[in-house]
C-alpha cells in the first residue's frame, strides 16, 4: 500500500526516479546495498504499548511528564529500546553501504545520534525541525512578522534545548530588546501557551528552540508536586501527549486511506532538512542546516567533547561540516 502511494507521488512529480520495495529485516541489506543516504524515522514499541508505559509507570511513583521523548525516564526508556535496533542498522550499513549518510529523525535525538557517532562507523547527522521553526514561531507569537524577511540568527546547544544566541533583522539590528519588551504581556495572558520559553528569556536572556511543553519537563522549575499551582500558571499540559497521540494516529490513518484511494495530486517540499542535504551533497550546492553532531572538535567549548550538540552545519559536495560556535553563555 505504501508503494502505491509513493508511485502516485512520483507520477505527480513527472514520473522521475524509481521506487523499490523491501519488507522485513531479512531484506534490509538488499534495501541498503549501495545506498548514498539512509533516512531513519522509527518508533520501537510504537505508541501502544511503549509510549503508554513510558508515562504510566513513572506516574505511579510521582514522576510527571509532558512528552517523555528527550531525557528523563521516558527519554531513557525510548533510547534503551531503540539503540539495539540502531546498532543492527549500523552493522548492515557498515557492510553494504559504508559511505552512506545516516539522517536520523528518531528521538531521543541526542542519545541516538550520539550513540551512532560514538560507537559506529556510520556517518550520522541528527535532524530536528525545531531549529528552522524557532525564530519564525516566536515572531508570529509576538506580532513581529515584519522582521521575518532577511533575519539573521545563530542557534546552538543540544537538541530540543538549543539557544537562539543571536537574532538580528536584515539590517543587522539586534532584535532581542524588542522581543524582551513584548514578553511580559504574553506571560500575563492566562490563555497563552508558550510561557516557559518566554520565562527563559526573562531569566536567562535567550529563547530556546523546542516548545514550552517539552521544556517544562527538562528542569526542576515547573513540574513540582509541592507546587501544583505552577501547572496552571504556566499552562503545562501534563499527560496530554498520550491523548494527542491517539488523535494523531487516527488522523494519519484517515489521511493514508484517502491517499490510497485518491492518489497524491500534489506534493510540496517541506522545510525538513533531509531532502536539502541530499541535494546539496549530490549537486555540491551549499546549504546550511542545524545538525546534531559530536562535539569532538570542541564546537561548543564549554560542553563535553563526547556530547552530541546541535550546531550550524555547512552542507556541500564534501558532506556535512559542523561549524565552530564557541562558548554558550
What are these model-predicted stretches?
Residues 1-17, 28-29:
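Glycine-rich phosphate-binding loop and adjoining beta1-alpha1-beta2 segment
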Residues 140-329:
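Long, compositionally biased stretches enriched for glycine and/or charged residues
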